[in-house]
């Protein structure tokens, strides 16, 4: 356990940031799963809207430092491929 006041504060700050990051990562996963279920339903218009939401969530996660930009790009590419396969 930390004895210095600033170290104690850092522990508190890290705990709150960890919780926030977990929440954002969880909502990101939920958004991606929603897109995948819509794609399985084969509804093109809903899939486009769900892709837009998922891409926005991925970009936000990158800007907040939740995930790496390459992971977001890779995920968006895979989701776009599924959307394009649905259109074809």
Curated annotation (Swiss-Prot):
GO biological process: translation
PANTHER family cross-referenced by the UniProt entry: 30S RIBOSOMAL PROTEIN S20, SMALL RIBOSOMAL SUBUNIT PROTEIN BS20C
Gene Ontology MF: a single term: small ribosomal subunit rRNA binding
GO cellular component: cytosol; small ribosomal subunit
Keyword Ribonucleoprotein: yes
Name of this chain's protein: Small ribosomal subunit protein bS20
Keywords: Ribonucleoprotein, Ribosomal protein, RNA-binding, rRNA-binding
Record organism: Clostridium botulinum (strain 657 / Type Ba4)
């Amino acid at each position: 356990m930390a004895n210095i006041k600033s170290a104690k504060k850092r522990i508190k700050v890290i705990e709150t940031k960890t919780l926030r990051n977990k929440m954002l990562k969880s909502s990101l996963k939920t958004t991606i799963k929603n897109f995948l279920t819509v794609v399985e339903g084969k509804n093109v218009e809903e899939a486009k809207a769900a892709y837009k939401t998922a891409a926005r969530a991925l970009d936000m996660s990158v800007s907040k430092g939740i995930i790496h930009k390459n992971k977001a790009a890779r995920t968006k590419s895979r989701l776009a491929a599924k959307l394009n396969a649905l259109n074809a």
